[in-house]
Structure formats: structure tokens, C-alpha cells
Amino acid sequence: MKIALLGYGKMGQTIDRLAMDLGHEVVLRYTGDGPTPDLSTADVAIEFSVPEAAAGNLSSCFEADIPVVCGTTGWLDQYPEIIKKCEASNGAMIYASNFSIGVNLLFHLNEYLARMMKDRPYGVDIEETHHTQKLDAPSGTAISLAEGIIEHTDMKGWTLGNGAETEIGINARRQGDVKGIQIGRAHV
């Protein structure tokens, strides 16, 4: 498969190595400098850039009729508009805030526990630690965990830092070369 990598940071470089190891051809390594290059030689694009570039990169994929997998977080305020563009162009996009099987199991467990907590007087906080190269804070994973709780409880939203009684506080730390730690805490 011919792959265009849109975003060539830590994750883009990891995907590059894995794709090559599996016999795929990486035909484009776009670092984000300048306009999105010609995507016509790619069969698929993998988008792991920065929040400011994600929507533009996705739109370029739709315009080039290239299916795209996106793992960039921090741009979801533009998600409804991007979905409309994708549908209007008969494009194909897969988005997830985290592609780890283990984390997606955690998302389901999180929602199950949130339904159990609904009628109990618990507050919720989320603490996360990631490496210092992680650009967004909080991470998309922490936001997805918070949104799963909000959907199934009386919590009204989330905030970065300490939350009020009906808010989930997300404390995001960045240190060293930590791979990523998410800790949820329910309290009375």
C-alpha cells in the first residue's frame, strides 16, 4: 500500500517505521511546512499532525479522493464541518482519539462505570501524564474519557485543572519520556 504521512512528529515517524517493516511504501512524509503536497500517488493518508493543521490536511485528502485515518487530537471543534466536507465529497475518514485496543476497552469500561455512578454522589477527576513532546493538553484520550462520563452522568462538562462540583477536572502533566498514563478518580 502507498501511504502519505501527514505529520511527521513522534507518531508519524513510528508509523513510518512500522509501515516499512510491513512492506508498505511511504510515498510522502509531510512535516507541515508549506501547503499540503500532491497526494495523488498515495492509496491512503495517515494524519497525525497538529491541531492547527488537521482540518486542512483532512480537507486536502477529501479533495484528492484519498481515504484518511486521523489520530490528531485537539481540533474537534471543527469536527462537524469536516464530517460535512467528507460526506459532500464522498470521502472516507476514520478518526479516533486513541487507536490502542487497550485504551478503547478502557473507554467502554469507563462508560459502564459512569452508568453505575449516575445516581450516586460522586465527583470525578482525571489525571494524565505524557511525555514532554505531547503537544495537546489535555490529551484526546483524557477528553474522550471525560466525555464518556458526561454522557452517562449528571456531569455538565470538563475543565483543565480542578473542576467544580458538576465538572470533571482534568489535570494534565508533561514530563520526560513517559509513554502515557491516565488515572481516573471518583470521590464523594
Q: Across the structure, where does each feature detected by a protein language model lie?
A:
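C-terminal substrate-binding/catalytic lobe of Rossmann-fold NAD(P)-dependent oxidoreductases
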Residues: K2, K10-L39, K118-H187
